[in-house]
Amino acid sequence: MILKRVTEALEAYKNGEMLIVMDDEDRENEGDLVLAGIFSTPEKINFMATHARGLICVSLTKDLAKKFELPPMVSVNDSNHETAFTVSIDAKEARTGISAFERHLTIELLCKDTTKPSDFVRPGHIFPLIAKDGGVLARTGHTEASVDLCKLAGLKPVSVICEIMKEDGSMARRGDKFLSDFALKHNLKTLYVSDLISYRLENESLLKMFCQEEREFLKHQTQCYTFLDHQQKNHYAFKFKGAKTHDLAPLVRFHPIKEDFDFLTTDAFEVFFKALEYLKHEGGYLIFMNTHSKENNVVKDFGIGALVLKNLGIKDFRLLSSCEDRQYKALSGFGLKLVETISL
């Protein structure tokens, strides 16, 4: 079923059709209208503005953002999902920049190889978003999903995305009859971010285990697994054996590092050692993610942690967390199930 949905969606995307992409209920829980940038027309942009009603944005890769000299909109991103907005832009030729034709003109420029940074003015009425390297396997957002769709379809990695809102101005949520009726009315295919995650996991890998060895860690004997990701960064998993080891749903603690084992300089020194005591007693996995995230932002890079768990053959797990309401997104796409959260 998932393969069929993704295959049909990719075929539609290649042919210039719009799709509805939905994320998990525990994330933004919304449906976005997405379109490959190279198929943008004034009519399609007008359709998004008229029927989807959300903010029209353009998702693209970090390399393209760099090429067009699009810096982050803010120096500190503290939005709920850390959506990577750049400065907004208009085509230099545009007058007001807001008409469907002029917004299309700006999008068209983002898709051309010959476009220069000077072809845009800032700020404007198109809002570029930078997709995270690794796509939905690194961050489970609409931004990454729409760029992944372009890459999988063999198209330039620029997508137009727009949130779908109801007529009363409220968000159309996953599970709403509104979204299914919207898809039926406009003959649009629907895809889930978790579908893309599953599809990519079946066809590629961002993470490979290259070392497994017995290693002493803070005076405790562990099994150490070392992984290499697509950016040539190392990530580590230490397996602890405890008196109450739960093999079916092991304890897991995710921890960010800035360099190899540079955990002592993180913001969570006390929490780290509290988690360590749990693992020594009950057994489980301590996973170091080389993501340069702060402790309170580790969820942003959960994709890497999920890939580590998948490589270790773990399906169900219990999470050691310093924040009970922290939400880990699109777990089903990784074949994972969080059965319990233990507060530190």
From Swiss-Prot:
The record marks H125, E163 as: Essential for catalytic activity. It comes from the Bacteria. One of its GO terms (molecular function) is 3,4-dihydroxy-2-butanone-4-phosphate synthase activity. Its EC number is 4.1.99.12. Pfam families: DHBP_synthase (PF00926), GTP_cyclohydro2 (PF00925). One of its GO terms (biological process) is riboflavin biosynthetic process. Residues 1-202 are annotated as: DHBP synthase. One of its GO terms (cellular component) is cytosol. D-ribulose 5-phosphate binds at R27, E28, D32, R139, T140, G141, H142, T143, E163. It is an enzyme of class 4 (lyase). Mg(2+) 2 binds at E28, H142. The keyword DNA repair does not apply. It catalyses: D-ribulose 5-phosphate = (2S)-2-hydroxy-3-oxobutyl phosphate + formate + H(+). Residues 203-344 are annotated as: GTP cyclohydrolase II-like. Binds 2 divalent metal cations per subunit. Magnesium or manganese. Keywords: Lyase, Magnesium, Manganese, Metal-binding, Riboflavin biosynthesis. Its cofactor is Mg(2+); Mn(2+). Mg(2+) 1 binds at E28. PANTHER family: 3,4-DIHYDROXY-2-BUTANONE 4-PHOSPHATE SYNTHASE, GTP CYCLOHYDROLASE II-RELATED. In the N-terminal section; belongs to the DHBP synthase family. Catalyzes the conversion of D-ribulose 5-phosphate to formate and 3,4-dihydroxy-2-butanone 4-phosphate. This is 3,4-dihydroxy-2-butanone 4-phosphate synthase.
